[in-house]
Amino acid sequence: MILVLVGPPGAGKGTQAKLLCARFGIPQISTGDMLREAKRSGTLEKRYLDIMDSGGLLPDEAVIGLIARRTVEPDCSNGFLLDGFPRTVPQADALDELLASANQGGKRIDAVIQLDVARPLLEERLIHRRTDKRSGQIYHLVYNPPPPGAELEHRADDRPEAVAKRLDAYEAMTAALLPFYEQKKLLHRVDGVGKPEEVTHRVLSAIGRPGSGGE
């Protein structure tokens, strides 16, 4: 099964990706995680680092190559879930071309899931988000506060000015993506507000897999 999970920053894609991947036994491929790891390891070019820190979206060339290399690894043989890619119609076209290639064995997307969350809630989720420098665990100062002694980091792209820019950029760049997948009858819009398990149940029902994984 090949799933694409889309939604604005703060919609809960990372949480849902982990839950869905556990259900279907497929790996999560997060462009955000891959890019942040490249940033931490010092392998990300400075021009891309500057874009990330300011809350901008990276050009296609910085992302498509990562996806192409990752999706031919052995753990992707039975499918995978893409989190954060594609964001534009050109990226979606490139993904279709990649999946149809000989290296991929003529695969195709099974479903595209859009997590819908109102912008004010997205802003509140992101601005109060913190990351533990040592473990990488993500906390929320209000809803999921960190334990005492956690060494917290406020990501540059989670600061208020960067959050507004990220959401604006997402809305502008993905405006044509959802109609693209809707026309292909692949798009499933799901309310992303609620407990993680509730949202997962909505997703499974939307894609025709209610009760999947023993629920």
From Swiss-Prot:
One of its GO terms (cellular component) is cytoplasm. Pathway: Purine metabolism; AMP biosynthesis via salvage pathway; AMP from ADP: step 1/1. Its EC number is 2.7.4.3. Coiled coil: none annotated. It is found in: Cytoplasm. Pfam families: ADK. It is an enzyme of class 2 (transferase). ATP binds at residues 10-15, 129, 138-139, 194. AMP binds at residues 31, 36, 56-58, 84-87, 91, 155, 166. Keywords: ATP-binding, Cytoplasm, Kinase, Nucleotide biosynthesis, Nucleotide-binding, Transferase. It catalyses: AMP + ATP = 2 ADP. Consists of three domains, a large central CORE domain and two small peripheral domains, NMPbind and LID, which undergo movements during catalysis. The LID domain closes over the site of phosphoryl transfer upon ATP binding. Assembling and dissambling the active center during each catalytic cycle provides an effective means to prevent ATP hydrolysis. This is Adenylate kinase. It comes from Sorangium cellulosum (strain So ce56). The lineage of its organism: Bacteria, Pseudomonadati, Myxococcota, Polyangia, Polyangiales. The gene is adk.
